[in-house]
Amino acid sequence: MRCPFCGNIDTQVKDSRPAEDHVSIRRRRFCPACGGRFTTYERVQLRDLVVIKTSGKREDFDRDKLERSIRISMQKRPIDPERIDQMISGIVRRLESMGETDIPSKKIGEIVMEALARIDTVAYVRFASVYKNFQAADDFEDFVHELRPPSPPTEE
């Protein structure tokens, strides 16, 4: 592993342990050339995934981008960060185990929405507002109305 401080290629692992999400390894490293210390994370990647955007453009799957968008939708929500990490890891595992290396962005969005709907309705609506490109308050209202079960008829 290259040292981020001086570029030296020969760094030493001083400590390895499972990370808090239990799907990656946290390694503390030391550079004998400059004395720098840094942390790396290692996780299993089953296959290289390519995202096919709605425009047809192809780009490498970026777990960090997925994580950022999910965390934005969950800002200021009472959700344990470890649960968020587990959800993200579950989504990535599901994508990697689909058997396809090319995955439409629409499919990724659907999988994320399924996961968010099980955890937090507000985060689900926030994510949907970006994913489904809401343009007006009516879009929110229609979407939320679809979430609610029909009210029983009132007797007058």
UniProtKB/Swiss-Prot annotation:
unnamed Zn finger ranges: 3-34
Gene Ontology MF annotations: ATP binding; DNA binding; zinc ion binding
Cofactor binding note of this UniProt entry: Binds 1 zinc ion.
Keyword vocabulary terms for this entry: ATP-binding, DNA-binding, Metal-binding, Nucleotide-binding, Repressor, Transcription, Transcription regulation, Zinc, Zinc-finger
Listed Pfam families: ATP-cone, Zn_ribbon_NrdR
Domain ATP-cone: 49-139
Regions crossing the membrane: none
Transmembrane helix among keywords: no
Function: Negatively regulates transcription of bacterial ribonucleotide reductase nrd genes and operons by binding to NrdR-boxes.
Family, as annotated: Belongs to the NrdR family.
UniProt cross-references to PANTHER family, sorted A to Z: TRANSCRIPTIONAL REPRESSOR NRDR
Protein name as it appears in the record: Transcriptional repressor NrdR
The organism of origin for this protein: Ruegeria pomeroyi (strain ATCC 700808 / DSM 15171 / DSS-3) (Silicibacter pomeroyi)
